[in-house]
A protein has these predicted regions:
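C-terminal segments of enzyme domains that contribute to small-molecule binding surfaces
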Residues: 2-16, 20, 71-92, 98-100, ...
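Left-handed beta-helix
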Residues: 15, 20-21, 26-27, 32-33, ...
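A short beta-loop-beta micro-motif enriched in histidine and acidic residues
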Residues: 49
Length: 177
């Protein structure tokens, strides 16, 4: 794995987390217990910080990045990802807040200042534009993402299932090392 410091700040990775050897984690990134970071993920906490909550999985090819302090973005935009979150393959999450128990679908993009509330599901390929507030308990799809309906019971259950499944999978990978 490529774990790199940026300036004087090194990533902090909890015991029991899994970072695949083909992933890149740079700078001010904190990865909590039971997190899994899969191949080709880039988590670049260079110009602001990234925090990833317990039991979250970041799937293959996803990009996690932040925005710096500037006149366009005073204070910049860090990236906060809660616990039990699934970030699907090739998603881009940039300078936003994703609360607990969310799913960000494959190839979805969540931009600066957006907030994805607990229990929300952002559909594959959707775009959450800067500053959008994504209400929890609903499916959001499209470009820009729009609330289309309440999550069904099976979808709500899947939020928990996905987090647990990826904890089990990363434990298999860890035991094979």
């Amino acid at each position: 794995m490529s774990i790199r410091k940026y300036n004087t700040i090194s990533p902090v990775i909890a015991a029991g987390a899994w970072v695949d050897e083909a992933a890149v984690v740079i700078g001010d990134v904190a990865i909590a217990e039971d997190v899994s970071i899969w191949p080709m993920v880039v988590a670049r906490g260079d110009v602001n910080w990234i925090r990833i909550g317990a039991r979250t999985n970041v799937q293959d090819g996803s990009v996690l990045h932040v925005s710096h302090d500037s006149s366009f973005a005073p204070g910049g935009y860090p990236l906060s990802i809660g616990a039990d979150v699934t970030i699907g393959h090739k998603a881009v999450v940039h300078g936003c807040t994703i609360e607990d128990r969310c799913l960000i679908g494959m190839s979805a993009t969540v931009m600066d200042g957006a907030v994805v509330r607990s229990g929300a599901m952002v559909g594959a390929g959707s775009l959450v534009p800067p500053g959008q507030d994504v209400e929890g308990g609903y499916l959001w799809v499209g470009t820009p993402a729009r609330r289309v309906r309440p999550l069904r019971e099976q979808e709500r259950d899947f939020l928990d299932y996905s987090a647990k499944h990826y904890v089990d999978l990363k434990n298999e990978y860890l035991s094979a090392c």
